[in-house]
Each structure stands twice: as C-alpha cells, then as structure tokens.
A protein has these predicted regions:
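Short hydrophobic beta-strand that contains or immediately precedes a catalytic carboxylate
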Residues: 9-10, 134, 331-333
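Structured, non-catalytic alpha/beta "coupling" segments that mediate domain-domain communication
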Residues: 48-59, 129-141, 145, 230-246, ...
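Short alpha-helical segments and helix-capping/turn motifs at coil-helix boundaries
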Residues: 40-46, 117-121, 226, 318-319, ...
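Short, basic, glycine/proline-bearing loop/turn elements
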Residues: 24-33, 97-107, 298-312
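Extended two-metal-dependent nuclease catalytic cores across DNA- and RNA-processing enzymes
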Residues: 2-5, 24-27, 77-251
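Long, highly charged low-complexity segments
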Residues: 257-336
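Non-catalytic, usually N-terminal nucleic-acid engagement modules in DNA/RNA processing proteins
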Residues: 1-61, 67-71
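Basic, polar low-complexity surface loops/patches
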Residues: 16, 36-37, 47-51, 89-98, ...
Length: 336
C-alpha cells in the first residue's frame, strides 16, 4: 500500500440529512425530489477533487434498530420518520456513490459510526492517517493526532485541540462526558441536571465513570452527589450506548479500497448519472475537469421542454419585471 495514501471515511448518512435541510426543495423534471442528492453529489465531487490520491469509502447507517436498542429499547425512540420527500432520495444517493465507483458500506445491526470506528482502529494499527468526513460529536471520541475530522459544510478540520476546547477533556474521555450529560436527540438518559461543564469537572477530577463512582464521598455538593447515586444505572447504560464498537466484522479491508486516481477510468457512469438527475452545472464543471472527465464523450444534457424566458438587458425591461414582482408579491430566484 502506498504509505502516502490516507483513509477518508465519509459519514454518508449524516451528510444526507445536512444536505436535505441545508438546501431548498429541488425536483427533477419527472417530479422526483433531489435537493439532498444535489448537495451530496457536490460534496462527493469536492472530496474526490481534494483527496484523489487517498482511499475513500462512504459509510451509511443500516436499519434504524441496532445492538444499542437491545441495551436500551428507548434508544432513539423519540426520532420521527424521515420526511416523505427525502425517502426516495436515499436510493438515488447510493446510485451517486456507485457512479463514482467509490465503495460504500452498511452492515445490519450497526450504525455508520461503529463502522467508522472499526476502520479508524484498523488504520491506526497500520499507521495510516485517517480523515473522518463528518461533524458528528459522537465521532469525536475517535480523534487522535493521526485521526482528524472534516466538517464538509464548513470545510473545517477538527483535531485534538478542537475536541478538548469543545468538551474540556481529551477525545478518548468524551464518552464519559456524554454518559453523564445524556443526549435528548438520541434519547440517552445520562444523569439529570448534570451539564457539560459539571461533567467536565468531574471527569478531570476522577478520570472516568468508575473513578467517579469510587470517589462519590469526595463530592462536596450533596445534591450533585445524590443525583449521581440515584442515576448510576442510567449513567452506566449511557456509557454503553455512546461508546462506539471498533471490532465490527468488515469484509472490505483497507487494502481493498482503491484511490480515485486508480479507478478514474471508470467514470462514464458519472456523467450518465448527472444527466439523469439534470445536474447541468455539476456536469459542465466536471466536463472541464481533465482529471475526472478523461475520455468522456460530450453529450449534452437533454432538456424536457424548450426554454421559455424573457431576457432583461435594459433598464426599462428591469423596471417592468420589478412591477410584475410587486403585483405578484413573491419572487423565486434560481442561482444554479
């Protein structure tokens, strides 16, 4: 394996939702919603351009229930179903990943975070630098000097110091903070009334959950001590929920993952996919990218109907348009 190649782990499921909620509704000519597909596609293109010499895999959550629901049946029970216009986009996004010939993986019974933790451990054992493409706080427990995170929306890297500033403890101690504070979004109980600041103080004083409960007599605040005593079972359950599994049986090894530079000759599927979705701006941008568009025939994206527009190229026409907008009371602008 090329020692210079890094491992790029893309948290696909998390980014789908960020793309969906971060972009306005968009539809294909046939009415299929594609705003999340559009955002995801452009994120993937940016990653390929930036990390073409590195090994990349996109990881998704499988079914909603996993081994954590056996530990705590109420885990994530408060989450509703995905929006109706997002559901049909899941399969299209998987088509997108396939069109770029990037490997993708999901395993029944586990969350994407567990697979990311497993790959990160394997990479660490083989001295391979790892980049986790996600801003999910649950993954920050994995950060080391050799494992960083990348927030694709902000194009910001998250390292050890960033995690320490956020939680007040080392990355490997983040799980203790989460066990104490709980998580309303994921329905993780924690200890009621224990916030991040207090949790940070406790872990800095006692190192971990076991150390904390062995030294409850050293906690001067009676109310705090009683809360911890009463919620010990919930705290220990929460610790099991937030700790990521790093030993999932994965058939696709790091050595089996190729860099994009090695697979770019399979890129005809990319342009076929972009045409099918009507992503004209992305199509044109990639067509001019010699690295991605190697030997691609220039087939224009077919339009469903003839263009119908008014060209505004003088002040009078502009004023007429403004008057029309005032009459209607609403104006939509497409900046693609």
């Amino acid at each position: 394996m090329n020692k210079k190649s890094r491992l790029v782990l893309v948290d696909g499921s998390a980014y789908i939702f960020r793309a969906y909620y971060g972009l306005p509704p968009m539809n294909r000519p046939d009415g299929t919603p594609i705003n999340a597909v559009f955002g995801f596609t452009n994120m993937l293109v940016k990653l390929i351009e930036d990390y073409s010499d590195d090994k990349m895999i996109v990881i998704f959550d499988a079914a909603r229930e996993n081994f954590r629901n056996k530990i705590y049946p109420e885990y994530k029970a408060n989450r509703g179903e995905a929006p109706d216009d997002l559901i049909p986009q899941f399969s299209i996004i998987r088509e997108c990943v396939d069109s770029f010939s990037i490997p993708q993986l999901e395993i029944e019974g586990y969350e994407a975070d567990d697979l990311i933790a497993t790959y990160s451990k394997s990479a660490k054992n083989n001295n391979i630098e790892t980049i986790i493409v996600s801003s999910d706080k649950d993954l920050m427990q994995l950060v080391t000097e050799n494992i960083t995170m990348l927030d694709p929306m902000k194009n910001k890297k998250i390292g050890v110091k960033d995690v320490e500033e956020k939680f007040g403890v080392k990355p490997e101690e983040v799980i203790y903070i989460q066990a104490l504070t709980g998580d309303k979004v994921d329905n993780i109980p924690g200890a009621p009334g224990i916030g991040p600041k207090t949790a940070s103080q406790l872990i800095n004083d006692f190192n971990n959950i076991d150390g904390l409960y062995k030294n409850l007599d050293k906690i001067k605040q009676e109310k705090r001590r009683n809360i911890l005593i009463d919620s010990e079972k919930e705290v220990r359950t929460s610790l099991e929920l937030v700790k990521l599994k790093n030993d999932v049986d994965i058939s696709l090894s790091i050595n089996d993952i190729k860099t994009y530079a090695e697979i770019k000759n399979q890129n005809k599927k990319i342009f076929k996919f972009l045409k099918e979705q009507g992503f004209k701006s992305t199509y044109e941008r990639l067509k001019s990218n010699a690295f991605i568009s190697n030997n691609i025939e220039d087939n224009k994206i077919e339009t469903v109907s003839k263009p119908n527009y008014i060209l505004v190229n003088n002040k009078k026409e502009f004023e007429n348009i403004l008057n029309e907008i005032r009459k209607k009371g609403l104006c939509a602008i497409d900046t693609e």
